[in-house]
Amino acid sequence: FLAMHRHMIDGIRKAFPGHPELFAGFDHVPRGQDDPENPMPWRDVRWSAAQLAAIDKLEHIEDHVDEFATEDELGLYIEVPFRWTPENPSGFVADGSSGLHFMLHAQWSVAGSPVNLGIGENLILNRVFWDLHGWIDTVWERYRVARGLTRDDLEYQEALVGQCEEMHDQLDLRPHAGHAQEDAP
């Protein structure tokens, strides 16, 4: 989850190097309608107490690194509020603070929008998509720094390469025989 989003954000930042502010992410997750960070000030922003606790925890991740033994644990906590298992394919996590990524998408989804954050391939055209994913990426980077991890770590490098290969295969971005590309990924 985290490596896939890092690969995606790094790619978009490289594609638009003159506009880093577009992909920097929220400075903080907006808590209410009047919050200056709220990208849709005409809409009310509502969070449950558990979601606010998750936001506070992640915005102060350096004080909570011991709650996540691994980056995978952090990623699962952020990603979605459900965990699929063969026994319970639609099971939810009992911790209501888990799944903030899912809740961030839901908070600013607009039904019927061609760039709805809830579903669809066009969601990457929505500026808020980059605000929320940039924020998550910053939280992950701060976690890594607090753990003494660097971008030179072999496991980190392998995770990014793996996500790159998977994304390029899924999106069919690899050059095909007879169709060489000078700058192929």
What name fits each language-model region?
Residues F1-P185:
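C-terminal accessory segments of proteins
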